[in-house]
């Protein structure tokens, strides 16, 4: 059908908004997705196809339904960050969750609990700004990795971070030759990263340079200016390879403070290393932790923490267990977990094991771990792709009694739960929204092994 439409212009009206917050229309049964659109918007659609590429569509707005909500950011639709500032938050949350609700009702006969965001702006604790010649400091353009949208402020990061961004923009304007030019392969500075704790006052600023900038006269001069102009508690220079588009990774030089910042979650102190992952919105993630705290049984001895990272869940719920086993593939994160647990809970039998859970080699280790006792509670927080075949297979034959499945991708989570439906019974599900203005959600499912009796 699409071949017949190629190079012809058709008209399509947006019929609804999907869970990715994109408007959906149709041309002769061919679905089109249109960002930043709403039901009632009309577009001219021209399909075209280049050699060896998938068919694409050129969109031209014909008419737009009246907007009741004005995007507060002037860069909206140009910046690739937010995608829903044209939609009221109430409608955003409904669009993001409605299909999940219906599918859980249909497939599992269960209705998830929904917890909308309490803060819709100024919530994010980390932003990475690309630095381009100009100087231009901003985010990637929507749909393009090569172009940058210059930003004076960002409405989803903290106000303290925006103040530091303002100071940096004033500073870098005096060094026009410092930004790295991706085309000519000249210059030095690639990224400006801000990390602001939510439950402490600490702010970290990280500047990522090409390796050749290290130990130069220019570096020393710029270091002195940064110390005078920037106000963060921790200021770091980071050096990595010239062609790499990775921020806040590589060899570091500490100009001020430490190479980690302090965050508090559930009353526990976390040292967050400059290059490590941490929940982007700890306040928005709190409902997940409250849910687990409420549902964890008191009479169980052993917590298994899969995809444990630096022991986030282990440390928060350690007071309920006698033994903790954490598993992850990144040794540096495991070292942090071991150190923190030995300091906080020296009497708990804790071990953190390096295992690649997406490797076939993990199967035998997981099956031994999961068959050791029916007094085990499992918490798993996998990446967006889900648990993976080897974890799923091990769970099917396991003695794990209670399982908390935390996910940043409820769609892949639901697919995994379907594969486990003959072995575990879903007790409750919570879906929450730590990421307003974007299509992302967080969820937690509480499962009980079907043949387990208390």
Swiss-Prot record:
Family matches, as Pfam families: tRNA_U5-meth_tr
Xref: CDD domains: AdoMet_MTases (cd02440)
UniProt keyword annotations, A-Z: 4Fe-4S, Iron, Iron-sulfur, Metal-binding, Methyltransferase, S-adenosyl-L-methionine, Transferase
UniProt keyword Nucleus, yes or no: no
Top-level division of the source organism's lineage: Bacteria
Gene3D superfamilies to which the protein is assigned, alphabetical: 2.40.50.1070, Nucleic acid-binding proteins (2.40.50.140), Vaccinia Virus protein VP39 (3.40.50.150)
Cellular component terms (Gene Ontology): membrane
Amino acids binding [4Fe-4S] cluster: 73, 79, 82, 154
Protein name: Uncharacterized RNA methyltransferase LA_2977
Organism: Leptospira interrogans serogroup Icterohaemorrhagiae serovar Lai (strain 56601)
């Amino acid at each position: 059908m699409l071949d017949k439409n190629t190079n012809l212009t058709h008209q399509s009206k947006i019929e609804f908004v999907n869970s990715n917050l994109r408007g959906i229309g149709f041309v002769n049964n061919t679905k089109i997705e249109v960002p930043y659109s709403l039901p009632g918007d009309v577009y001219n659609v021209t399909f075209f196809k280049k050699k060896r590429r998938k068919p694409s569509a050129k969109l031209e707005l014909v008419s737009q339904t009246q907007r009741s909500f004005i995007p507060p950011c002037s860069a909206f639709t140009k910046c690739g960050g937010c995608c829903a500032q044209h939609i009221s938050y109430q409608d955003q949350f409904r669009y993001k969750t409605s299909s999940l609700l219906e599918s859980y009702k249909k497939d599992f006969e269960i209705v998830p609990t929904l917890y909308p965001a309490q803060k819709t702006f100024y919530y994010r604790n980390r932003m990475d700004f690309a630095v381009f010649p100009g100087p231009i400091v901003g985010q990637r353009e929507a749909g393009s990795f090569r172009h940058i949208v210059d930003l004076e402020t960002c409405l989803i990061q903290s106000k303290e971070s925006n103040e530091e961004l303002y100071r940096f923009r004033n500073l870098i304007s005096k060094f026009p030759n410092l930004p790295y030019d991706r085309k000519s392969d000249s210059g030095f500075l690639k990224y400006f990263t801000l990390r602001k704790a939510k439950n402490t006052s600490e702010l970290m600023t990280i500047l990522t340079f090409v390796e050749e900038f290290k130990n130069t006269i220019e570096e020393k001069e710029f270091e002195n200016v940064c110390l005078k102009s920037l106000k963060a508690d921790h200021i770091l220079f980071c050096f990595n390879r010239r062609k790499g588009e990775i921020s806040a990774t590589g060899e570091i030089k500490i100009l001020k403070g430490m190479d980690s910042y302090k965050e508090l979650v559930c009353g526990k102190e976390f040292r967050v290393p400059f290059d490590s992952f941490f929940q982007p919105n700890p306040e928005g993630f709190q409902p997940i932790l409250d849910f687990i705290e409420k549902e964890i049984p008191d009479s169980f001895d052993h917590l298994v923490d899969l995809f444990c990272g630096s022991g986030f869940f282990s440390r928060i719920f350690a007071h309920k267990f006698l033994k903790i086993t954490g598993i992850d593939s990144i040794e540096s994160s495991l070292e942090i977990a071991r150190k923190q647990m030995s300091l906080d809970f020296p009497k708990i039998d804790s071990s953190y094991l390096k295992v690649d859970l997406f490797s076939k080699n993990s199967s035998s280790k997981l099956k031994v771990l999961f068959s050791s006792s029916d007094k085990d509670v499992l918490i798993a927080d996998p990446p967006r792709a889900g648990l993976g075949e080897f974890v799923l297979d091990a769970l099917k034959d396991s003695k794990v009694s209670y399982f908390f499945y935390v996910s940043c991708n409820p769609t892949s989570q639901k697919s995994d739960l379907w594969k486990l439906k003959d072995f575990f019974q879903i007790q409750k599900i919570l879906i929450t929204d730590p990421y307003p203005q974007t299509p992302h959600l967080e969820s937690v499912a509480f499962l009980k092994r079907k043949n387990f009796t208390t």
